[in-house]
Amino acid sequence: MSNLTLSQFLQQEKGNLTPELAQVIDTIAATCKTIDQALQKGALAGILGSAGNENVQGETQKKLDVISNDYLIDALKVHPHVGGLASEELDDFTLAQENGEYLVLFDPLDGSSNIDINMCVGTIFSILPAKNAVTQAQDFMQAGTQQVAAGYVLYGPSTMMALTVGNGVAFFTLDPETQTFLLTTENVQVSADTQEFAINASNQRHWEQPVKQYIEELLAGKTSVREKDFNMRWVACMVGDVHRILCRGGIFLYPYDLKDPKKAGRLRLMYEANPMSMLIEQAGGASTTGRVRILEIEPTELHQRVPVIIGSKNEVERVTSYH
């Protein structure tokens, strides 16, 4: 039996998935194929390295950050069902089509520091319902519970898409010969327990005490109250770390720290935390800042940052109980 294509899968889905939403998702997938092709060329096309400027986050942009962002902006701003879009790379939102039913938010190339060393990167996207015929900035200020779809594309040894439209999580793999996303896993589930964790341990001295306590217990392994050993993984690309969790369980932490107390966290609520939280929760996992469920946060600004603790439910609940 042949695998369903992404388009065929979307035609069969029900619930929140309207034909218009399916078209938006198809366009995102098609654009990610173009990004994938650019990444494959890399040094051959002279597009590795820095673009020589910073984005709104104060981060140095890679050339492929800019290229990927442009591809998505160009494809979505003319889409008849997209009222507006927002990118992690741009200060303000981009107005799209009048009466477009959906708003699209995205991180065009997550983990771009990995580009020049040929490690995994990804595209993350979130889709919200539009609020007005002509999109306004305030229309994007919706809690993650309002998302109608979320997903990512992982550019790795094989190019894969993880997608939820509010009815579980499915994986699609890009066939390099036909350039078609094919359904390869349905009903993805995150195991409730795990022995893997992902955190940037170089920030340990800046963590709050609850996170310090939790990680110290994991590192102590069998000699601690946990009575089992844990392995640490860190890809420096949220897409890569979350994909691993969806495949075999685990917990990912980018907690609040005291290095810059004015910043609530490192990761962006709208472009990273919300879509990844929807995916993880739809697969049976959990997602929190350590104090509140991420999907229930009412955003106050487009580039709002939050702490993120996400993954296997029992581990997320345990570290939350320490706060």
From Swiss-Prot:
Transmembrane segments: none annotated. It comes from the Bacteria. Its EC number is 3.1.3.11. Keywords: Carbohydrate metabolism, Cytoplasm, Hydrolase, Magnesium, Metal-binding. GO terms for biological process: fructose 1,6-bisphosphate metabolic process; fructose 6-phosphate metabolic process; fructose metabolic process; gluconeogenesis; sucrose biosynthetic process. Mg(2+) 1 binds at E88, D107, L109. Substrate binds at D110, G111, S112, S113, N200. Binds 2 magnesium ions per subunit. CDD domains: FBPase. Belongs to the FBPase class 1 family. NCBIfam families: PRK09293.1-3, PRK09293.1-4. This is Fructose-1,6-bisphosphatase class 1. It comes from Acinetobacter baumannii (strain ATCC 17978 / DSM 105126 / CIP 53.77 / LMG 1025 / NCDC KC755 / 5377). The gene is fbp.
